[in-house]
Amino acid sequence: LDHSKDKNESNNRAERVISHALVEMRRLSWWPFGIKSAVLLDVSENGFKIEFTGKADYSQGEQLVLSIPLSPFGISAPRAISIPVEVVWFDKEKMRCGGIFKNNDPAVVIFVRKIMEVSKGI
């Protein structure tokens, strides 16, 4: 067996960076109820991992909106970016969730890259 390959390289995962930004998970971007706060643990161009600050319960395949405030990343406008996401996994014990970004909008990609760039320096 050849163990010389990096773990990320061997399973073709996108580069991920660690973050500690507070984010919100919503059912709909405009709906002010049922918002769950979470800590963004890591992010890549394809997806994310978060840990909720309180109780939450989501299912695999659920379509949600992840709202990421941009000021902690040195971006003054817009205030936040809301990205449609799909839940890939949810851990009820750890209150953690991982998912993928559903929107390939070039603006979203630019903001996610900026978040990753700033997070690398933390």
Predicted stretch roles:
Residues 1-45, 51, 116-122:
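N-terminal helix initiation/capping motif
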Residues 2-3, 94-122:
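C-terminal output/interaction extensions
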Residues 17, 32, 60-62, 79, ...:
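Residue-level preference for beta-strand/loop junctions
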Residues 18-24, 54-72:
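Short coil-to-beta transition motif at edge beta-strands of beta-rich domains
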Residues 36-38, 81-88:
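Short beta-strand-centered aromatic/proline hotspots
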Residues 45-46, 90-95:
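Short, conserved beta-turn/loop elements at beta-strand boundaries and strand-helix junctions
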Residues 51-55, 102:
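A structural micro-motif recognizing beta-strand termini
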Residues 71-82:
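Short, Lys/Arg- and Gly-enriched loop/turn segments at beta-strand edges
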